[in-house]
Amino acid sequence: MQIKTKFKRNNLVEIIAEKLNTKELTDIISSEIDKEVKLRFYTQKDPKGNKWQPNGRGGKILRDTGQLMNSIHRISDGKVGGVATNKIYARIHNEGGIIRPKEKSKLKFKGVDGKFVFVDEVEIPKRQFFGMNKKLKDRIKKKISKKILENIKNS
């Protein structure tokens, strides 16, 4: 004995799409990423769980003023969900790299002792705060699946 059910694929897809608010889904994505990225500033760990390299001054890494962490904001428009920052120094801290002077012969900044230091270059260690990992992806998938099922049930 066989039981066969035929769905008109177009009708089912149309029903789901009609009831599905993609803005809700991208809101979930951006919210979960935002929480995870900001948590990394407190745990001082990268997406793989590795500790960030300590800084020379001690204290909380990348949190002296809180400007970088507080600049991270959600992006969600129904097509894309994520986070961004407008701080130009975010990339060098996230990816690491070498900073060299552009206009002068030396870089000038305050050292650990508060006195000015002049150097040819500064190596910034990678302290990744942006990035996905399996745990975050799984959490997002679970929340999106739940939201889709709620929308289907309520239709």
Regions found by a protein language model. Name each.
Residues 1-155:
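Short, Lys/Arg-rich flexible segments
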